[in-house]
Curated annotation (Swiss-Prot):
Protein name: 4-diphosphocytidyl-2-C-methyl-D-erythritol kinase
Single Gene Ontology MF annotation: ATP binding
Catalyzed reactions per annotation: 4-CDP-2-C-methyl-D-erythritol + ATP = 4-CDP-2-C-methyl-D-erythritol 2-phosphate + ADP + H(+)
Species this protein is from: Ureaplasma urealyticum serovar 10 (strain ATCC 33699 / Western)
Gene that this sequence comes from: ispE
Keyword field: ATP-binding, Isoprene biosynthesis, Kinase, Nucleotide-binding, Transferase
InterPro entries in the record: GHMP_kinase_C_sf, GHMP_kinase_N_dom, IspE, Ribosomal_Su5_D2-typ_SF, Ribsml_uS5_D2-typ_fold_subgr
Residue ranges of coiled coil: none
UniProt enzyme class: transferase
Length: 265
């Protein structure tokens, strides 16, 4: 089975402080699938007692260790009592550490494909979030745009409800998401600025304003070169927001231009 594993961008990102005995941050965001940026994944049933995962660029095999992919394979096997094993070939195009959900997309596509091959249709999103990750349910959902909350397990389909013209600006920086969240946690004072009900209403009326990413300033503190690029994009006239923990930007522009992806060398 051959499948595409698409990237996503986060339009606005509100992060809530962790509550006692809760290991994950609750958040709100609008996730948008980016179908022009994707990894190619091939899934082959093999006659072995272990799974075999390989990563490639356009020409060669490369070393990438994704704990999430192996964790997903283990979760599938334990949850659904699957006995078959698989070789997974992943041709990487989604940049690593770019805030585009590449690892989660890979995990979701692998999960969905293997369950399809095994004839299994039911997936518990809350269990996926608790055991694997908050971005995975979006990639499982089939939605092109969604309002996401409840640690990623609750999704409201917004596909086709507004038209947004944007560029995705990819920087050649691998951001450490864990460090960005640690910076966020160290900050004692935090005010939620986004009102997603208003943001969604405005987007449907072609109004883009008052959209914030709570991780943006913490990313900039750790990576000053990303802040520099942000200021440069602002000077070019874009409404610019960091995607996730970084390093990619969503640059919103005039709606009569085509969406595109720009790579920073």
């Amino acid at each position: 089975m051959k499948v595409k594993s698409f990237a996503k961008i986060d339009l606005g990102y509100s992060v809530y402080k962790k509550r006692k005995n809760i290991t994950k941050h609750d958040f709100e965001s609008i996730f948008i699938l980016v179908e022009s940026v994707y990894d190619d994944i091939e899934i082959i049933k093999i006659d072995k007692n272990v799974d075999d995962v390989h990563y490639y660029n356009e020409t060669n095999e490369i070393y990438v260790y994704s704990r999430l992919v192996y964790k997903t394979l283990e979760w599938i096997r334990q949850t659904y009592r699957i006995k078959n094993h698989y070789r997974i070939n992943i041709k990487k195009r989604i940049p690593i550490g770019a805030g585009l959900g590449g690892g989660s997309s890979n995990a979701a596509v692998i999960m969905k494909s293997i369950l399809e091959l095994e004839g299994i249709k039911e997936i518990n999103y809350k269990d996926v979030v608790n055991k694997l990750g908050a971005d995975i349910p979006f990639f499982l959902s089939g939605y092109k745009t969604a309002y996401v909350s409840d640690c990623g397990s609750t999704l409201e389909d917004l596909s086709g409800q507004f038209k947004l013209s944007y560029e995705v600006h990819l920087m050649n920086v691998n951001v450490n998401t864990k460090l960005v969240f640690e910076k966020f946690d160290d900050n004692q004072w935090h005010v939620i600025k986004n009102n997603f009900k208003t943001i969604i209403k405005n987007l449907k009326e072609n109004i883009v304003t008052n959209i914030y990413n709570d991780l943006q300033e913490h990313c900039f503190e750790l990576y000053p070169n990303i802040r520099y690029k942000y200021n440069e994009l602002l000077r070019e006239g874009f409404y610019t927001i960091l995607s996730g923990a970084g390093s990619s930007f969503i640059c919103i522009k005039l709606k009569d231009k085509e969406n595109q992806v720009i790579h920073e060398n």
